[in-house]
């Protein structure tokens, strides 16, 4: 085990759950065997409407059964603790949490006082042990990553001070850029095979130290090092006689009494979640401090698409190796960047008519390349992605040269106008049908202006066939993602069709 892993293990044991202050020796075979049998339920929030897509990713990458909650935008699946690294590498999830206990049919009392009293009594009856171990491992590795990042930044500064010239300054700048990224960049840290091995070892250490713990020992350990916590209640349903704040207040007070933790609404260590949807109640512990959807974007625009939503749209069209994937209205480039990260055997083109948008997309691509070089520790040959400025109604692409088109079309709210969409949408669909391969091409288009899009699509039935529609919520706006299939009919330019002659292409 490496020195930094030992340091992380000591740090973890410094706040271990059974009060054992002595170093714990690691018995490799026994501990690994135990860790493999420790199963926990992980919950994840996903873009509303893409629950099936996220569940498919879980089944594909984790080989785990996944169930979709009746509360929209959430999925649940069981994993071994040592698979935590793979969970953080999922592309379709926004936030992660470990489930403490789930009540599928919780019986609420008739009065507010009785319900809140039940919440107070519930805190001491829950199986906190395993979820807190998972939270512990997750927190320890985030701290380790922060220390490594700080060390890399310091090393870069030292090289610059030693007169390494522009190259050292550039390298230091890259490391500074990496250090400014958010908690979501823990994804890259977890993707390292060496880190995955360290996770298994650390899991063993924690399980060994917590082997014989009880609820009483949990409470005792919090006294030397008091954790700060808060309770967040997410409630949906009309038949509740209490508010979210009341539930969080009383449940949080009971947790404080049980663990002797200190309540802190802003600078907290542990966030306990109380999710209530009708009669379904789930108590959980958050594993992410902020959403993972910002993972690839550093230069934001007025309508930047969430990376998790971009992944869901790309997954809908099932990219195959060597596919040419185009986003003709790319904005900040969220869709092509997500595509280049996950489907590196395809070629991705980001285009927009706004030079500011193209510049943002180019900067985001450059940042992604820099991050890849820092993560791998070596110079890479680049990414299968490029950005270009063009007119969506007159794309500089050959006819039938594109396999997939994925784009976020103007809603007519923050960008463009609904009046202009009546001319823009038909022209876009016509030009997309020209560059898309007949018979095999597909398009995934996101829009909130459903009336205009439906009208435009009705006039394109000879070249586009609607396959599926996913209803999503974008910042409170009810939008739709349309999956279209290109028909086998060859594109005929309107001018050639009117004159009755064969098109030049």
Swiss-Prot record:
Expression sites (tissue/organ): Ubiquitously expressed. Abundantly expressed in the testis, also expressed in the brain, heart, kidney, liver, lung, muscle and spleen.
Main location: cytoplasm
Keywords for this protein: Cytoplasm, Methyltransferase, RNA-binding, S-adenosyl-L-methionine, Transferase, tRNA processing, tRNA-binding
Bias-annotated ranges (Basic and acidic residues): 156-173
One GO CC term, this protein: tRNA methyltransferase complex
CDD domains: THUMP_AdoMetMT (cd11715)
Entry-linked Gene3D superfamilies: 3.30.2130.30, Vaccinia Virus protein VP39 (3.40.50.150)
EC number: 2.1.1.256, 2.1.1.-
Subcellular location, record wording: Cytoplasm
Example of a GO biological process term: tRNA methylation
Region (Disordered) residue spans: 145-182
InterPro entries linked: RlmKL-like_Mtase (IPR000241), RlmKL-like_Mtase_CS (IPR053943), SAM-dependent_MTases_sf (IPR029063), THUMP_dom (IPR004114)
Protein family according to the UniProt entry: Belongs to the methyltransferase superfamily.
Function: Catalytic subunit of the THUMPD3-TRM112 methyltransferase complex, that specifically mediates the S-adenosyl-L-methionine-dependent N(2)-methylation of guanosine nucleotide at position 6 (m2G6) in tRNAs. This is one of the major tRNA (guanine-N(2))-methyltransferases. Also catalyzes the S-adenosyl-L-methionine-dependent N(2)-methylation of guanosine nucleotide at position 7 of tRNA(Trp).
Name listed for the protein in its UniProt record: tRNA (guanine(6)-N(2))-methyltransferase THUMP3
Biological source species: Mus musculus
Lineage: Eukaryota, Metazoa, Chordata, Craniata, Vertebrata
Name of the gene: Thumpd3
């Amino acid at each position: 085990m490496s020195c930094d892993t030992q340091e992380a293990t000591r740090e973890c044991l410094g706040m271990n759950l059974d009060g054992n202050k002595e170093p714990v020796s690691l018995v490799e075979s026994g501990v690994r065997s135990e860790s493999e049998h420790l199963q926990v339920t992980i919950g994840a929030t996903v873009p509303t409407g893409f629950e099936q897509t996220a569940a498919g990713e879980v089944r594909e990458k984790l080989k785990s059964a996944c169930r979709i909650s009746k509360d929209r935008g959430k999925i649940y699946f069981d994993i071994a603790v040592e698979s935590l690294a793979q969970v953080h590498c999922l592309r379709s999830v926004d936030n992660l949490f470990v489930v403490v206990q789930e009540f599928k049919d919780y019986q609420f009392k008739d009065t507010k006082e009785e319900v809140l009293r039940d919440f107070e009594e519930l805190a001491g009856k829950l199986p906190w042990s395993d979820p807190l171990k998972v939270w512990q491992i997750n927190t320890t590795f985030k701290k380790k990553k922060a220390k490594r990042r700080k060390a890399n930044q310091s090393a870069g500064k030292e090289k610059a001070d030693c007169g390494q010239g522009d190259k050292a300054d550039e390298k230091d700048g890259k490391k500074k850029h990496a250090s400014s990224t958010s908690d979501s960049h823990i994804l890259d840290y977890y993707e390292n095979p060496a880190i995955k091995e360290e996770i298994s070892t650390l899991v063993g250490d924690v399980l060994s130290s917590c082997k014989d713990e009880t609820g009483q020992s949990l409470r005792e350990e919090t006294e030397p090092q008091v954790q700060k916590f808060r309770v967040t209640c997410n409630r949906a349903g009309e038949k509740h006689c209490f508010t979210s704040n009341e539930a969080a207040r009383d449940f949080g007070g009971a947790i404080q009494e049980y663990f002797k933790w200190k309540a802190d609404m802003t600078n907290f260590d542990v966030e306990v979640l109380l999710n209530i949807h009708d009669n379904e109640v789930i108590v959980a512990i958050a594993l992410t401090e902020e959403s993972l959807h910002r993972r690839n974007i550093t230069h934001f625009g007025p309508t930047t698409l969430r990376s998790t939503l971009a992944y869901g749209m790309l997954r809908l069209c099932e990219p195959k190796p060597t596919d040419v994937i185009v986003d003709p209205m790319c904005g900040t480039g969220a869709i092509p960047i997500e595509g280049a990260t996950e489907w590196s055997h395809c070629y991705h083109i980001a285009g927009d008519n706004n030079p500011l948008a193209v510049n943002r997309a180019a900067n985001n691509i450059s940042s992604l390349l820099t991050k890849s070089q820092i993560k791998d520790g070596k110079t890479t040959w680049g990414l299968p992605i490029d950005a270009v400025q063009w007119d969506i109604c007159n794309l500089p692409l050959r006819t039938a040269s594109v396999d997939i088109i994925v784009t976020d079309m103007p809603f007519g709210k923050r960008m463009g106008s609904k009046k202009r969409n009546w001319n823009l949408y038909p022209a876009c669909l016509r030009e997309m049908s020209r560059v898309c391969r007949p018979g095999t091409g597909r398009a995934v288009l996101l829009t909130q202006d459903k009336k205009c899009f439906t009208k435009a699509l009705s006039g394109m039935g000879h070249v586009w066939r609607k396959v599926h529609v996913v209803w999503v919520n974008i910042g409170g706006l009810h939008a739709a993602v349309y999956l279209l299939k290109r028909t086998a009919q060859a594109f005929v330019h309107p001018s050639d069709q009117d004159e009755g002659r064969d098109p030049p292409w």
